[in-house]
């Protein structure tokens, strides 16, 4: 009972400290304003008129001062970055014919890897502990025995995912293809010629002066890189919009070998994609869902271990796949630390920044063994969208950032329902929060993504308006069942 009382007292002490630091300027100004008000009340009308009459300004001085104020204001507003709005987005929902229950996945594995039962057993153990559910999907070409990862099959998957997501976005926003000013496509492992962005331009007959970009090889954090590219372009092109397509094409990247480190992606990655509409038009302010506040990118490619921890390569038999290093979680943790060191001062309240600075100075000057202070990011954000790369990734970030189960619920449920959809997973998570009716006006969202190279990228969004629970979308047919309990091990 005494421990409980102490914890309650400590909680209120911390709340009082936070209130004092975060409202320091307000508390400081209150006595000043009160003093001025009291002095004015003590003065009579004649004294006030006498003070006003003593303030003589020449007309020239007034005009010069006015001109200076107007000039400074004009320069300020012209140099101020344009606000970037997230008008709306759409997540691809695969058809039920692409569903891959555990039983089907393991049956395919036994038939494809019939000469190597140990690899089959390894995949089964991974799947049991993966956090994936029975409704994740793989493209049609992977359902064949053996799989048929041809160029045509890969293009068919790309068209199915991208065009469906774009059609939904057009329907939800009323945007016409001819009105698109900027197009950015990110797909890490499938980079055909002509590019995927050219495929979209051809399909929708987009304008000849459209600014199109196709990003490949950027990994699971590529969606936020695309947002960064779009933000920079929207700063120099006024009254414009940008469409971002984030996806990963699974068809050509199914690994057929026996290397365990390269079999992991087969168990985790599933098909998916998202189409996102950004705009810098002031007229879109009232209908936009979010506005972009901050975007921070961290790249640790100069370090050899970080560079090599996620690598596309051939095994000894010539089978191409993605090799995931055992050091992946350690490297991801280091990248996250570097990223939050940059984004922390931009978003954390003064109370948390002061505690973090005190801890840092204490470790540098007094004792390096002092436990570092982990800022409470729950004071800066109401919602967290952590890349659903796997159960271990979500567990590690929940532990490091001291988040509750509800804070990482969107990530866990997205992994369960859709699997690791690579760069688009952040948008499935945001869609989950909206589908649960939790997104309110002025709520802040932190998107965190990791990618090969090794990269950690963060984006901070602020909700423009309370989001009504959508009646359609990727979660529309299953949101009533979520959240679900996900056991540590699912016996197959």
Swiss-Prot record:
- Span-the-membrane segments of this chain are 20-40, 59-79
Which Gene Ontology terms describe the biological processes this protein takes part in?
A: fatty acid biosynthetic process; pollen tube development; response to cold; response to light stimulus
Instruction: Using the record's annotation, list all stretches that form the FAE domain.
Output: 76-365
Question: What EC number(s) would the UniProt record show?
Answer: 2.3.1.199
Membrane-related topology note: Multi-pass membrane protein
Q: What class of enzyme is it?
A: transferase
Family matches, as InterPro entries: 3-ktacl-CoA_syn (IPR012392), ACP_syn_III_C (IPR013747), FAE1_typ3_polyketide_synth (IPR013601), Thiolase-like (IPR016039)
| Catalytic activities | a very-long-chain acyl-CoA + malonyl-CoA + H(+) = a very-long-chain 3-oxoacyl-CoA + CO2 + CoA
Name the keywords, alphabetized: Acyltransferase, Membrane, Transferase, Transmembrane, Transmembrane helix
Q: Where is the active site?
A: 220, 299, 383, 387, 416, 420
Q: In which pathway does it act?
A: Lipid metabolism; fatty acid biosynthesis
What task does this protein carry out? Mediates mostly the synthesis of VLCFAs from 26 to 30 carbons in length (e.g. C20:1, C26, C28, C30).
State the protein's name.
3-ketoacyl-CoA synthase 5
State the organism of origin: Arabidopsis thaliana
Lineage of source species:
Eukaryota, Viridiplantae, Streptophyta, Embryophyta, Tracheophyta
């Amino acid at each position: 009972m005494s421990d409980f009382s102490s914890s309650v007292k400590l909680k209120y002490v911390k709340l009082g400290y936070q209130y004092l630091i975060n409202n320091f300027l307000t508390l400081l100004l209150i006595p000043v304003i009160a003093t001025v008000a009291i002095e004015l009340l003590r003065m009579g009308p004649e004294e006030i008129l006498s003070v006003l009459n003593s303030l003589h300004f020449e007309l020239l001085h007034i005009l010069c001062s006015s001109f200076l104020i107007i000039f400074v204001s004009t320069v300020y507003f012209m140099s101020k970055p344009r606000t970037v709005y997230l008008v709306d987005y759409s997540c691809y929902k695969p058809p039920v014919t692409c569903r891959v229950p555990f039983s089907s996945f393991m049956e395919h594995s036994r038939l494809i890897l019939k000469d190597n039962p140990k690899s089959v057993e390894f995949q089964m153990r991974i799947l049991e502990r993966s956090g994936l559910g029975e409704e994740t999907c793989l493209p049609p070409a992977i359902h064949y025995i053996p799989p048929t990862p041809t160029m045509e099959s890969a293009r068919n998957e790309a068209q199915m995912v991208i065009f469906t997501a774009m059609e939904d976005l057009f329907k939800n926003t009323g945007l016409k293809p001819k009105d698109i000013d900027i197009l950015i496509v990110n797909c890490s492992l499938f980079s055909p010629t002509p590019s995927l962005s050219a495929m979209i331009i051809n399909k929708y007959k987009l304008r000849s002066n459209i600014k199109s970009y196709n990003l490949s090889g950027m990994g699971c954090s590529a969606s936020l890189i695309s947002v960064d590219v779009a933000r920079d372009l929207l700063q120099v092109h006024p009254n414009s919009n940008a469409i971002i397509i984030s996806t990963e094409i699974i068809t050509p990247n199914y690994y057929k070998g026996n290397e365990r480190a390269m079999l992991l992606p087969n168990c985790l990655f599933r098909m998916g994609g998202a189409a996102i509409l950004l705009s810098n038009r002031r007229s879109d302010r009232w209908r936009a869902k979010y506005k972009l506040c901050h975007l921070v990118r961290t790249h640790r490619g100069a370090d050899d271990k970080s560079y090599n921890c996620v690598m596309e390569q051939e095994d000894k038999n010539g089978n191409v796949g993605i090799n995931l290093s055992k050091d992946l979680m350690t490297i991801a943790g280091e990248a996250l630390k570097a990223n939050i060191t940059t984004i922390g001062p931009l978003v954390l309240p003064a109370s948390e920044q002061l505690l973090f600075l005190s801890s840092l100075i204490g470790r540098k000057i007094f004792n390096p063994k002092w436990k570092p202070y982990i800022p409470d990011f729950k004071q800066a954000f109401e919602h967290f969208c952590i890349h659903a790369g796997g159960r271990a990734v979500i567990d590690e970030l929940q532990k490091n950032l001291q988040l509750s189960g509800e804070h990482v619920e969107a990530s866990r449920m997205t992994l369960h329902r859709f699997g690791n959809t690579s760069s688009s997973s952040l948008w499935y998570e945001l869609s989950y929060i909206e589908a649960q009716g939790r997104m309110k006006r002025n709520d802040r969202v932190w998107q965190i993504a990791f990618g090969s190279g090794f990269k950690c990228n963060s984006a901070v969004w602020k909700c423009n308006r309370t989001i009504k629970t959508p009646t359609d979308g990727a979660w529309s047919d299953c949101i009533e069942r979520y959240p679900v309990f996900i056991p540590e091990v699912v016996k197959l």
